[in-house]
């Protein structure tokens, strides 16, 4: 859709839409679990081609997304780099604190293998966020040694879109448990 929109849009928006298209391809790759491809696609976009009024928000979101990708790739050097970038990124409508807390929780659970209750105490804002929160909540419960809660959370997302890596991992866990 973005590709069509970028080609058919008025000239001043065209470059912005093209860059968004590149970034969105990375987000789709992330959701499918292809983290290396996600990193490559998300890193290709040129912030200077984004319409000036959207740059701060785009930088904040892209840094957040790239940090999540690097956490799943277990790339300590890039994790440190994008954490620093996220801390320097300008806030956009008060969303920065939430994104920082979320990435810290993901890093604790996935990279550091430490318990972090963020996903148990925070409410998701939409269905995709609910799936993500259930996935990381299940990993957190697994770190706590709470097999029942882990199973329950994975079961709650196992019937969702099978293309999502959250769902694929939940199914692997449930199949391995039987």
Regions found by a protein language model. Give the residues of each.
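Alpha-helical repeat scaffolds
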Residues: 2-8, 35-47, 74-90, 111-126, ...
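Cytosolic, positively charged, low-complexity intrinsically disordered regions immediately flanking transmembrane
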Residues: 18, 91, 95-99, 111, ...
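Long, non-transmembrane cytosolic or organellar matrix-exposed soluble domains/tails
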Residues: 116-178
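Short coil/turn linker motifs that delimit alpha-helical repeat modules in TPR/alpha-solenoid proteins
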Residues: 13-14, 51-55, 92-94, 125-127, ...
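Short coil/turn linking the two alpha-helices of tandem helical-hairpin repeats
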Residues: 31-33, 53, 72-76, 108, ...
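Non-cytosolic head/periplasmic domains of membrane-anchored proteins
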Residues: 44-100
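"A position-specific structural signal for the A-helix of alpha-solenoid helical repeats
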Residues: 17-27, 31, 58-68, 96-106, ...
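Membrane-proximal, non-transmembrane interface segments of integral membrane proteins
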Residues: 1-69
